[in-house]
């Protein structure tokens, strides 16, 4: 008895579905133009929805690929109500990094990338290349925790060292190991660069670019307070309070010696500091 009721129910549903489909196609035949417009409208709406969701996901996960992204901060200078700037001078960055044991590592990146012209020699044959490069201090590999496929987080410690993204290493050296290879500058006055490491490419939604990272000269603007041309990032210990780090620096840094006797942190016409977490950098506006 139960099986009979079950099969009758299935047959009824099948008849209902056939009726719905018959009516649907009947409407399509009678109102072709309206039906086509409705289908097109739904298709466009679906595509627009998918594009919006892809953009939302791209922005929401920006810089989230970096390990401990929430512990990485960019140090910004705030000019009262006039806005802020993300470029720092090297001696200021050095003083800030050394101001607290809560800061595990700090690094500088030049405010822009540059194109480098170089060649490699293989069996007496030269092959020339032009690739983008970013001049950085060695700590960048530890602050951002590069996923090193060859080499280590100390790969930029020596002068003239470079690390390459995996895609660039394969482009230049194929399946051979890139470590130890020389990139000879087209400028005869410049020393050759030595590949000391290869890192896994960053995703597109990352503040870091898939370029050659070159080790900054230890002498470059080392004590130059007038050269503000670097992005400055620090990595704090897990669970550390950024407000505590800033307060500690302001209390112990001799700002009057660096900026003048009338300097006071946070005054309307003076300077203040801000630590912007790495995932928030993408969304921050009004920053020079």
For every predicted segment, state its role.
Residues 49-179, 185-192, 246-247, 251-262:
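Structured, solvent-exposed hinge/loop segments at the ends of secondary-structure elements
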Residues 2-46:
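N-terminal Sec/SRP start-transfer signal
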Residues 1-5, 9, 134-150, 162-288:
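Mid-to-C-terminal secondary-structure elements
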Residues 17, 88, 129, 224-226:
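Residue-level signature of the cytosolic catalytic core of signaling kinases
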Residues 3, 15, 26-27, 35, ...:
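Membrane-interface anchoring determinants
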Residues 16, 23, 47, 51, ...:
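Amphipathic alpha-helical recognition patches that constitute DNA-binding helices
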Residues 16-20, 84, 270:
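Juxtamembrane loop-helix boundary motifs flanking transmembrane segments in multi-pass membrane proteins
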């Amino acid at each position: 008895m139960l099986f009979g009721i079950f099969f009758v129910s299935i047959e009824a549903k099948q008849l209902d579905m056939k009726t719905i489909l018959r009516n649907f196609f009947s409407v399509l035949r009678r109102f072709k133009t309206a039906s086509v417009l409705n289908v097109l409208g739904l298709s466009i709406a679906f595509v627009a929805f998918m594009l919006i969701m892809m953009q939302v996901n791209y922005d929401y996960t920006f810089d989230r690929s970096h390990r401990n992204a929430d512990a990485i901060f960019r140090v910004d200078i705030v000019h009262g109500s006039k806005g802020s700037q993300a470029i720092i001078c090297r001696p200021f960055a050095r003083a800030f990094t050394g101001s607290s044991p809560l800061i595990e590592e700090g690094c500088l990146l030049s405010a822009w990338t540059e194109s480098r012209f170089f060649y490699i020699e293989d069996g007496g044959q030269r092959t020339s290349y032009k690739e983008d490069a970013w001049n950085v201090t060695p700590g960048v590999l530890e602050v951002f925790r590069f996923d090193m496929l060859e080499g280590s987080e100390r790969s930029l410690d020596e002068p003239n060292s470079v690390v390459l993204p995996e895609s660039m290493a394969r482009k230049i050296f194929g399946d051979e190991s890139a470590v130890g290879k020389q990139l000879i500058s087209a400028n005869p006055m410049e020393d050759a660069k030595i590949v000391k490491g290869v890192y896994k490419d960053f995703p597109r939604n990352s503040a870091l670019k898939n370029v050659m990272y070159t080790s900054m000269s230890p002498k470059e603007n080392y004590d130059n307070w007038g050269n503000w041309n670097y992005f400055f990032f620090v990595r704090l210990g897990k669970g550390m309070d950024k407000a505590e780090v800033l307060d500690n620096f302001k209390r112990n840094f001799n700002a009057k010696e660096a900026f003048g006797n009338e300097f006071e942190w946070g005054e309307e016409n003076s300077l203040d500091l801000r630590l912007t977490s790495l995932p928030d950098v993408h969304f921050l506006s009004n920053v020079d």
